[in-house]
Amino acid sequence: MHELSYATSVLNAILEAVEQQEALGRKVIKVNDINLEIGELTLLSVDQLQFVFEVISEDTVCKGAELKAEMVKPKIFCMDCEFEGDLDTKDELEVICPKCESRNVKLKGGKEFNIVNATIEFDDEE
């Protein structure tokens, strides 16, 4: 279950951002949601990622934060007909050009895992 390592990375990055805000004198109450970009070729389960994140963030300001994921399709470039477009990831084992059926293709992207942003609630009284 590689979702644990991804969830741990997200939690560590967000907690580091929280520390930076608190070092600037801003009191963080909680993190409400975290928006991610996830490439389809990572084969991550968003449901499992959310579950693991809930478990490991239990005693932090991220407790209860919702992970929201936008799935990113990999792009394909055909070296024969120069087709460029989204790759259908139904069958990851067979990568062929949808236009000319050539196997002489290059993949671009699809393995992304990025934190886009997070919604953080601050104590406005300070």
From Swiss-Prot:
Q: What does this protein do?
A: Involved in the maturation of [NiFe] hydrogenases. Required for nickel insertion into the metal center of the hydrogenase.
Q: Which residues bind Zn(2+)?
A: C78, C81, C97, C100
Recorded hits in PANTHER family, A to Z, give: HYDROGENASE MATURATION FACTOR HYPA
Name the UniProt record assigns to this protein: Hydrogenase maturation factor HypA
Task: Give the residues the record marks as binding Ni(2+).
Answer: H2
Q: Which gene encodes it?
A: hypA
Which GO MF term does the entry hold, naming one?
nickel cation binding
Q: Where are the transmembrane segments?
A: none
What's the source species' lineage? Archaea, Methanobacteriati, Methanobacteriota, Methanomada group, Methanococci
Which GO biological-process labels does this protein carry?
A: protein maturation; protein modification process
Instruction: Recite the UniProt keywords alphabetically.
Output: Metal-binding, Nickel, Zinc
Query: Which Pfam families does the UniProt record give?
Result: HypA
Q: Which InterPro entries match?
A: HypA/HybF
Q: Which Gene3D superfamilies match?
A: 3.30.2320.80
* Family membership noted in the UniProt record: Belongs to the HypA/HybF family.
